[in-house]
Amino acid sequence: MIRSNKPPENSCLLYNKGLMPYLEAHAWQRSLLHQRIDYPNLEDVLILLEHPPVYTLGQGSSLEFLKFDPNQSEFEIHRIERGGEVTYHCPGQLVGYPILNLRRHRQDLHWYLRQLEEVIIRVLAVYGLKGDRLPSLTGVWLEGRKVAAIGIKVSRWITMHGFALNVCPDMTGFGRIVPCGITDKPVGSLAQWIPGITCEEVRVHVVQAFAEVFGLVLVES
């Protein structure tokens, strides 16, 4: 019997990383994206990691949602190509960067955003928590508090950026911004409902939910 070394179409490389500087992860994403633009048959990728404290602004983000002067700031801040307003990353927040070829899934950005929300909702359900979507907003809420932010960039139907789930972060950094430009809804973290929860245990459930929602077989790399 002749066996093919070609991976199945629904395989997805999983990179489980620890704490990674934002710009390093951003450059890595861009490299993976451009590889897949040039070679569309390459496998999908999911990167899971945490970042040191950093603020990021979407390409059209307004500076009015910063409560500090970005030109005279001790805080790391970057404007990037994703959609959405300002957000905050820090240890204790689990960040997922899917690099997916949507031609293999569905060429529909609204569908993709809802699928990312569904991943988070399924993770929360593992803990008996009901994650909510809100009309006209992107992300996932728990009892009125936003626990997951989502922002994406898609080039030639290849995705980058992704989701950030507040597991057990120090929430202080969120107080320096209006997260995602939403003035009337607070942010929250899973630790407020589940004391002692860690990113390490949540990773397992994120991987399982991501595989189920997107119909992928994740292979740790």
Curated annotation (Swiss-Prot):
The keyword Manganese does not apply. It comes from the Bacteria. Residues 40-218 form the BPL/LPL catalytic domain. The active site is at 180 (acyl-thioester intermediate). One of its GO terms (cellular component) is cytoplasm. The record marks 146 as: Lowers pKa of active site Cys. GO terms for molecular function: lipoyl(octanoyl) transferase activity. It is found in: Cytoplasm. GO terms for biological process: protein modification process. Pathway: Protein modification; protein lipoylation via endogenous pathway; protein N(6)-(lipoyl)lysine from octanoyl-[acyl-carrier-protein]: step 1/2. Its main location: cytoplasm. Keywords: Acyltransferase, Cytoplasm, Transferase. Substrate binds at residues 82-89, 149-151, 162-164. It catalyses: octanoyl-[ACP] + L-lysyl-[protein] = N(6)-octanoyl-L-lysyl-[protein] + holo-[ACP] + H(+). The keyword Transferase applies. Its EC number is 2.3.1.181. InterPro entries: aa-tRNA-synth_II/BPL/LPL, BPL_LPL_catalytic, Octanoyltransferase, Octanoyltransferase_CS. Catalyzes the transfer of endogenously produced octanoic acid from octanoyl-acyl-carrier-protein onto the lipoyl domains of lipoate-dependent enzymes. Lipoyl-ACP can also act as a substrate although octanoyl-ACP is likely to be the physiological substrate. Belongs to the LipB family. PANTHER family: LIPOYLTRANSFERASE 2, MITOCHONDRIAL-RELATED, OCTANOYLTRANSFERASE. HAMAP family: LipB. In the reaction, the free carboxyl group of octanoic acid is attached via an amide linkage to the epsilon-amino group of a specific lysine residue of lipoyl domains of lipoate-dependent enzymes. This is Octanoyltransferase.
